Amino acid sequence: MASGKSTMASAKPTTCKEAIRRWEEENQQNAAAATEVILSFQWPPIEKMDNALATLINCEKLSLSTNMIEKIAGIGTLKNLKILSLGRNLIKGFAGLEPLGDTLEELWISYNCIEKMKGIQAMRNLHVLYISNNLVREWNEFARLQELVNLRDLVFVGNPLYESLEVEQWRLEVARRLSSLEKLDGEPIIRTEENPIQLVKTDSPSHDLLQEPV
């Protein structure tokens, strides 16, 4: 048993370069030519995003979910990237995403350690944001989302701010603040001239139903 623990403790994190090599072997494909690359569930987990990711020049969807990444890095040159999946890591903020502000359309970053929303306003083209089960607790942090004029689909369930309100009150507050939003926590928001905000009646959303795919 002791030797097993020692082996785990001494195992080095998987590098992005190694994860890409594994992906190429499994898929019999050159990663630089691929439009979708999945580097999720690495063992030992990836701890650092680095410049090896810059080789994924044609990538439109990149997944690094379920690792132990703390900071976003190494993807600033991926101008074709439209969907980035970083769920189930240890990420605390949005620094590192700024160069993708005009091109990234979907960010899946649920189950991380994000408390402050600083930097999200740089993602001008974002249509979809899955940020459930993080640590956001203040409306003044949430307010940064008001600058994302293209945001249509938001999943925010599981944050302390969400937990502090009844579901119906939460949905009314968000719909009022984000006038372009069409879908919140998996349920549509319907607006008409007579009634600017109509909310589909729903029970408290299931956290499992709102988990984004890999």
Predicted regions located by residue number:
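Short, mixed-charge, low-aromatic patches
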Residues: 7, 97-99, 128-134
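Extended, charged alpha-helical interaction scaffolds
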Residues: 107-162, 171
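Canonical leucine-rich repeat
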Residues: 46-49, 72-75, 94-100, 117-120, ...
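Hydrophobic aliphatic residue packing
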Residues: 69-72, 91, 114-117, 136, ...
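Alpha-helix boundary recognition
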Residues: 54, 76, 121, 146, ...
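The feature captures the LRR N-terminal capping module
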Residues: 1-68, 80-92, 99-106, 152-214
